[in-house]
Structure formats: structure tokens, C-alpha cells
């Protein structure tokens, strides 16, 4: 509460009281029956005769004086004239001093009308009731009413008999109350702490009286923080409004009026977003209040008749991100830890960096140490939006490069994909090697190979190496038989993924992609549209997206050449199979004599099937109460063969066929 402006407000109300005393004296002098105990409850013949004998004259004229304090700031922001201020004070008085209720009841000649009417207010301001200039100050388009500072009630009554009222929030503000209007809780908030951002162009525009701006939000651009910083630099407080919650309110008109009233009262600019559909711009427009709107889409000219200043909220340069990390973390870093380097592959805006730094500091405090690279990456991951969880399966990576058993050429391509993700800020932003053609800043890849060759695990390893989560989308569940629904499902996924720092893996990509053939029927045409849409959306995606398919031959070359990295996963050869068996059987499980050479040479299995067989063998051994031996492993392989539809024969199982056949009886 700030009461510094109260002396001036009380002085202005005291001056109003003196005019009211004079008005009461004049009324008494003309009263035909001042001692009537029922005056104001009925009209007598004498009262009517007195009305016929006199004219309704204004009270004693007065000289308006300049307002100061909160009243003066409010008048300046809302563009109020001296007359507007006096009308506001007349309407405000009963909410500050209850005696004014009786004063107004007496002057209205109606004890039930305890607020100033329009006619009484004009006369107290020295104007006749028929004054066009005075009536104009009470018009819905007037500064007082358009800003929500004054409400005219009793619309069914004649204009002069309508009551004037000041909203409670305006009364509270003038009395020093800085709490947000209760009706706006959950919809709007006052931004006290502004994250530093490079808002030069927008700041200059707001200084130059630009009152509508639209920021197209890019991942990591921090449009919200950019708008707040520009408003603060331009001398405004910041009122942030959640566009989705505002739209969801049943009485949107009353709520937008409350937002504008709050902004005018605080001398605040409005930050509205993120918007996707038509926002209520007209209801939030005021000549003195800047409105900065932000959203992920391009500006639609139909949203407003007034063209806005258009600005792209581009991702922060690497140097700016490093400066923000250092400013937020201070000296609490572990030796040798570079926050910018540890989180270089995360696309974070200023506000996200501030929150991630707080999360990292809290985690380090709980762990009883200083902030490490892992704390930083965990803090950055905590800024992921939650919407993608409903559309994709989230995987917290638990594997690393050492867990991969792949040919060196394949591993090299995987490292290249991770390097692209790690250094894209430097290459695209600093070196300005943007690909053009409307492509985004993202990294795209294709993993092709038979089931079990390591495609999903490789995506998990890449995510782990970058400190990111893996989000898996099964495209077979996205495809819809109804025309256009598949594209809508994909758009929802990419829209939610834009707010997430993670690796997006589209599994079973052949459910959508296929050789583009001649269009023979509507099914062919729409199948081609779906595949083209997925590729186009991947190209404009700013994140990391990988397609995984079992059918490499089904993919059109025109598609694969537009992806950054294409990795073919072959079936493992004998040396790799031996390594896989050794790795999958593990070092902690008790192991008897297992013939790894035989397993590798006899059974041509992919890595996924080898792992499945090893796990099955471990369960068989645990159930038997002994170590993992050839009996358990061969039995597990036999089960894997049956799952794959293969015959269990002597050619593969050789001298261990008896163990495989014996497993059938288990």
C-alpha cells in the first residue's frame, strides 16, 4: 500500500465538500417545506409549484486545479481533462467518505439515490444540465468511460438521473492499493522482475508512440520477455495477460474492460499472448496504453484495422545466452563449468534461462554442492512444455555411446547428427549459414534398418549425449482414415514440440512415407499429401527430429535427400554379434560357461533380438536358482526363433538342438 498521494486526494475532496455545502445552503433557501420529515419520498403540490417557478441552474462555478500524485498520474495516462477529474471526484466521494451519500441523497431530493447523478455531477462542476460539452465527458467513448474509470448505471432512466460510480479497483488504486484486481487473478499478472533482453527496435517504437506491436515468437526467442523489457525501458509498468485464459472466460467483455482499467490505473503496457486465433484487440486498445501481442503464427491483417509494428523474436545469440547464464548463476558454478557450453544445444529464451538457472541452483543446494553441468542440463530440461506428453511417449535416456554396438561408419554418422544439434547455434546464427528456402534451424535425420538393429536405442543415445529427453511418436497411430485428420494430428505434435527441448523420434515412418506413385485414386492422392506435409513440417521444425523406418526402399529419394543425416543400420555381422552377446549377458549376472563364439556364428539375430534372448535367459536362470548357462541361452534363442516365425532346426542349433527341443516342454 502506498499512501503518499492521499493528502492531495483528501484536499480535492475537501474542496468538493465546500461546493456541496454551498449547494445544500442554496437548496435550503429554496425549499418550501424544509421541516417535512418525508421530504424526498413524495412530491407535494408546493414542491411542483416551486419547480415551475425556478430554473435549474448550475451551482457556483469553480476553477479546476491541476491534479498530482496518483490522481494526476491517472489523469495523464487516461488523457483526462480538468473537468474529467472533477467528475471523477464527484463520483468517487461516497466511496471515500460515507457522508457524501447523505449529501447526494439530499441534493437528489431522493434518500434512496445516494450516488451523484449525471445532472447533479454536471451542476457541481459548474455546468448546466443541458451542457453538450459536459454531457460529452460522460459519453461511452469519453476518456473516463473508455478507460473504465467511470461507470454510468441505471440505463433505463433519463440521462440526467443516471447514477455515476467509480469501480472499486480504481478507488483502491487512488487510495494506495497496489493489489491486482481480483477478477484478473489467473488471467493477468503484474510483471515486477523484467529479464534483460535486447529490445532496442521495439523500445524505440514504443517511445515513438507506437501503440500496437506484434512479435512472432520463435523457439528460444523470448517474445514475452522481449515485450516486457521494451515496455519497461519505455517507462511503462508491465501487465501480462494469458490469451488462452482470457478467451476461455464466459464474460470476456467484462474481463477485457478490467484488463484495460488495470493497465490505465498502473500506467502499464499490456503484453497479450500467446495468440493463435483472433484476439480481442479492439477492447484492449487505448491511445495511451501500448499493446504488445505475441504468438507463433504470422500476423493476420483481419485482427485489427490498425497495422501493428511487426517484429520477429529470433533466438538469442550464443553470447547473449552466455551472459544471461552467468548473470543468473553468479559464482555458484563448479570449477571449469561453462553454462553456455553445457546448454548450447538447448533453445531457451531469457525467461526460460532465468527459471532454469534457479532450478539448477536449487538442485545443487539439495545435493550440497556447487552447480555442475548436469544440474544445468536438468534445469534446462525442466523448462519443457507439458503438452507433448499427451501426444508422444517420453523417454528419459539411460544409455550412452558405450552401450552401442554398431559398425564404425554408423557410429560416425550418429556422432555427426549429435554434432549438428550441438553446434547449430554457432553455424546458423553466428556464421549465418542458414539453409534458406524457409527451412528452420532444426536437425533432421533418417534411421533405416530392420527391426532390432538399434534405431530407437541410437536416438536415445543421441538424446542422452545432448542432455535431452527422447519423445517417441508412433506414426502408425497418427495416420487417420479421414481426409485431413492426419495432417491435423501431425500439426498438433509439431506445435507442442516447438516448446520442448528434446529429440523427436517418429517411429514406423513407412506408415506415411512411401514411393510416390501415379495417382490412381483419391487414396493415392491423399497419401502423397500426408507424406509431403510431414516432410515440409520437419524442414521448418526448429528442433531435432528423426524418422525411423524398417523399409528403406519405400522412401522416395526426393525425401531422403532433404534430410540432414541418413543412417542405414545393417544387421550385425558375426564379430558384432559376439560382442552383443557378451554385452547383453552382462557382467553382474552369474554366468556359467557360455559359448559366445557358437552363439555369434550360429544365430543370425539383430541386436534387439539378442538382448531379448539374453534377458529371457537371465529370468530362466533366476527361476532355476543357478547361473546363466548354455541351456538357458539356447532355450531363450529357441523362444525368440518361434516369435520370429523361424524353424528351430539342427542347421542353426547343431549340437545344442536337444536343449532347444527340451525348452518346448517348459
What does each model-found stretch correspond to?
Residues 141-142:
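Short, hydrophobic-biased segments on the C-terminal half of alpha helices
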Residues 74-84, 132-133:
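Structural motif
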Residues 256-284, 496-517:
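Conserved nucleotide-sensing/catalytic segment adjacent to the nucleotide-binding pocket
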Residues 120-133:
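Short helix-coil junctions and helix-kink-helix linkers
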Residues 11, 83-96, 146, 258-261:
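Short, hydrophobic/amphipathic alpha-helical patches that form generic packing surfaces
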Residues 42, 46-77, 103-113, 158-239, ...:
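AAA+ P-loop ATPase motor domain of ring mechanoenzymes
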Residues 145-155:
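A short, conserved structural fragment
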Residues 1-63:
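Extended, charge-enriched "interface" segments that sit outside catalytic cores
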